[in-house]
A protein has these predicted regions:
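Metal-dependent nuclease catalytic core centered on acidic motifs
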Residues: 1-38, 57-180
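Short secondary-structure boundary/capping segments within folded domains
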Residues: 33-35, 44-47
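Beta-strand-connecting loop/turn residues
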Residues: 41, 49-50, 166
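Conserved catalytic cores of phosphodiester-cleaving nucleases, focusing on short active-site segments
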Residues: 43-45, 52-58
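Structural motif
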Residues: 50-52, 122
Length: 180
């Protein structure tokens, strides 16, 4: 089962890298392409001699939602449905999980060799939250402002990949802090 989960996770990461690279190419009229998939990071990308790297992570509303999603997507894995209960403050739950997920990545020193070789990379956060709406970023900013982070300087920017009605939207997340 671990092999199936890993295969599913790699497909998910590859999808998010492709979605991100396609959008960056469109926005900036660039020609980035994936050179390698060392894992970690998920991809080494290059455009006209400029090389960078991409790390992908996922942020879900809560652990139960993540477990249900992964078990549903992974062939042969026993389904683990979310409990049938009222979810109070889903935006706040998602925002807290998002802040914890991003904090963990920003504080991870093991990305240092990639930063040193290619410069700061891109952190792509796959938003696994079906209720994401216009108020969600406000909750995310509040949760982020309340989070203490020892940023290792490994990422130049953070992008969100958010599911929309007819596809996905790539959003630059501006996470400026008052204390920075």
């Amino acid at each position: 089962m671990a092999t199936n989960r890993r295969t599913t996770q790699e497909a998910h990461e590859r999808f998010n890298v492709t979605t991100f690279v396609d959008e960056i190419n469109r926005r900036h009229r660039a020609s980035y392409r994936v050179l390698e998939e060392p894992n970690p990071p998920e991809a080494i990308i290059q455009s006209k001699g400029k090389t960078s790297w991409v790390e992908v992570t996922s942020a879900s509303m809560n652990r139960s939602f993540a477990e249900e999603s992964w078990s549903h997507a992974t062939p042969g894995e026993k389904p683990r449905p979310m409990p049938s209960e009222v979810i109070i403050g889903p935006d706040a739950q998602f925002a807290a999980n998002f802040a914890a997920t991003v904090k963990k990545k920003l504080e991870k020193a093991s990305y240092g060799p990639f930063r040193d070789k290619y410069g700061p990379g891109y952190l792509v956060v796959s938003v696994q939250y079906p209720l994401y709406g216009r108020d969600t970023p406000r909750f995310m900013r509040r949760a982020w402002q309340a989070t203490q982070v020892e940023d290792q300087g490994c990422f130049r920017s953070i992008y969100l990949v958010v599911r929309r009605y007819r596809g996905y939207q790539v959003i630059l997340w501006r996470h400026a802090r008052n204390d920075a």
